[in-house]
Structures are given as structure tokens and as C-alpha cells.
Amino acid sequence: MSCLLIAASGTGGHLFPALAVAEALPESWKVSWLGVSDRLESSLIPKKYQLSTIGVEGVQSRGIKRIVQIFKLLAATGSVICLIRRNRIQIVLTTGGYIAVPAVLAAKLTGKKVILHESNAIPGKATRLLGRLCDKVALGWPPAKKKLPGCKVTVTGTPVRKSFLMKNKLPSWAPSGPGPLIVVIGGSQGAVGLNDMVRAVLPFLLDQGCRIVHITGKNAQSKIIHTNLVEQPFSDDIPGLLQNADLVISRSGAGALSEFAVCEVPAILVPYPYAADNHQECNAIYASQFGAALIVHQHEPEGKALRNALERLLKKNLSQADTVENLLNLMRKGMAKMAVRDAHIHLMSLLKEAS
């Protein structure tokens, strides 16, 4: 039996790729999970795997607070060392973020193999800091290589959960009818800027006969009531929505983009403007280079740039313009080219080599 510790915490972008790998592992593998008590994993992971939690945060402050953060990091590393020994862990897999620091340090101090997966087109701070300590750094996309000199890198793609690789029907609660289906994903925390931009163009889209599913996240719903509009804070039916959508409007996290790619759904991307190292902008640019997405910036006039992009993409659907192949079809092909459907297999191979 191989014993694996997965260190993944916080957002879906860190958790879901790790979950995709865990789902694909043979039953002979025993998986333990390392997370933080007040994050998404506390409600998601215990349903399937043994979850152990630690207190950890970035060392970014100054003065006394910085000293406290360093002591917390050392204590967290000690806790992970105890966990590795207690559960007889042989390999550590992490998807980056703050939790990667104590996980990688503990793995090296106990002589265990460690693999770090970086989804973004530009590697995060933890990946840049820890990459050389890892036995392998697996990348979602090739551009990240340039920022990781001296690391043992390999491009695997970013794993998506198996539900995205299966054929799914459109949920029965989604609006039905002939109009184009637009899915808006505000994210688990509720992307206020993105949601506000979308709400500014809702009347236009509904007047044109579009069907809209808006996953708002932790954000109040609009006051518009229409048979072609469904708003929900969360949904477990994202694979079915994406596979049957004509267009998705979303932030540009690497995990979400990987899901869009395997579902071959064209995207309008609104990068989160305050993301660390501007990584969402880099992700969006990478997708646009495949012709898979258009980029709209949040700082542009409210609703205007988004409406312009929508009018451009939906021209054939809205006005029946006589074109050989409309832009949405070309973008769908771009997403297909960007997709890596067997990323979980590549990562499993790395784990098996290390075991």
C-alpha cells in the first residue's frame, strides 16, 4: 500500500485538481489530506478522505506580527512531521499556496518524496520559493517554466474532476428554449465586480432571447425576474452547465480554465485585478492565444466592454449574420486545443514513480 499526503487548501483552484488526482488513484493507495480548519476543504474533504488541519498563513507582515507568523509556520511544520510519521506517509503532493510551505519542509526533513503541482501560467510565490526542494514540479501550462530555473519541471496539465470528463445533461432547472445559453460563474466567494458587470447587461441579453444561468457565489441576487434567468449562489451541476453552454463568463483561475477547456466552452474572461502576481491576467492571455477566450477588464466602463464583447460573439445567434463559421465555433476549437484531458494520469505516473 502506498500512503499519500495531499496538502491542498483554500480555493477550488487548489482543491479540485488535487481531488481529481485522488479520485483517479487505485484503491491500494491510502490518501490523507492536510488543510486549514476554516477553509473550503473543511466541508468538502471529510466526506471522502481523512482530513488533518493546521494553522498556517503567509509570512508577509513586519515587526512582532512577522515573528508570530514565523513561529506559526515552524509549529505547523512540526505538526506535519508528526502527521507524516503517524500515518506512515511515503509521498507528499501539494498544489501550492500557504499550506505548501510546511508540507514541503516537513517532507524534506523526514526524507519523503514531494511533488508540487502549479496550475497557473505564472507560478505562485510558494512554488517559486519551494520548487527547488521538490522532487518534481508539475505544471499546468508551459509558460510557467520560465519562472522556475533550476527546478525539475514537467508539463502535465491541470487535472479536472472525473465528472467533467463524462457526458452530462443540462440540469432540469436551467432555462430551456432555443436561445443561446450563457453561464456566469462568480466563484465560491462571489466576484462582486464581475457580478455587477453581468447584471448591467442582463436586460440586453434577456431582450435578445438568451438563456442565462448565473452562479453568484456569496453575493446578493439581482432584482430581475425572468423565465430565462436563473440565479443560484452555488451549484453541483457545473459540468452539465458548461458542456451545454454556448458561452461562459468567468474569472480566469487556472482550475476553472482547465474545466472550460475540457468542456470546450468559449469564454469571456474577467481577470481578478488584485490576484497575486497578476496571475489571472496571465492565465487569460494564455487562453486567448489559443483563440479560446476574449478578455474584458473589470476597470473598463461598467457593462460597456462586456456588452461589446457579447454583441461580437453572439452576432450570428442574435442577428443570423451570414458567416461561414462564427467566432464562438472558432473559440470552441481553441478550447479543445488547450484541453489536457489526461492530466490526472500524468500526475499519477509521477506519484507511482516516486513511490
Swiss-Prot record:
Signal sequence, renumbered to the chain: none
Pathway in which this enzyme or protein is active: Cell wall biogenesis; peptidoglycan biosynthesis
SUPFAM superfamilies: UDP-Glycosyltransferase/glycogen phosphorylase (SSF53756)
Keywords: Cell cycle, Cell division, Cell inner membrane, Cell membrane, Cell shape, Cell wall biogenesis/degradation, Glycosyltransferase, Membrane, Peptidoglycan synthesis, Transferase
Catalytically driven reaction(s): di-trans,octa-cis-undecaprenyl diphospho-N-acetyl-alpha-D-muramoyl-L-alanyl-D-glutamyl-meso-2,6-diaminopimeloyl-D-alanyl-D-alanine + UDP-N-acetyl-alpha-D-glucosamine = di-trans,octa-cis-undecaprenyl diphospho-[N-acetyl-alpha-D-glucosaminyl-(1->4)]-N-acetyl-alpha-D-muramoyl-L-alanyl-D-glutamyl-meso-2,6-diaminopimeloyl-D-alanyl-D-alanine + UDP + H(+)
Binding positions (UDP-N-acetyl-alpha-D-glucosamine): T11, G12, G13, N120, R161, S188, Q280
Molecular-function GO term, any one: UDP-N-acetyl-D-glucosamine:N-acetylmuramoyl-L-alanyl-D-glutamyl-meso-2,6-diaminopimelyl-D-alanyl-D-alanine-diphosphoundecaprenol 4-beta-N-acetylglucosaminlytransferase activity
Top-level division of the source organism's lineage: Bacteria
One Gene Ontology cellular component annotation held by this UniProt entry: plasma membrane
Location of the protein in the cell: Cell inner membrane
Segments forming a coiled coil: none
Database matches in InterPro entries: GlcNAc_MurG, Glyco_trans_28_C, GlycoTrans_28_N
EC number: 2.4.1.227
Topology relative to the membrane: Peripheral membrane protein
Matching HAMAP family: MurG
Alphabetized NCBIfam families for the sequence: murG
Name of protein: UDP-N-acetylglucosamine--N-acetylmuramyl-(pentapeptide) pyrophosphoryl-undecaprenol N-acetylglucosamine transferase
Native source organism of the sequence: Prochlorococcus marinus (strain MIT 9211)
Lineage: Bacteria, Bacillati, Cyanobacteriota, Cyanophyceae, Synechococcales
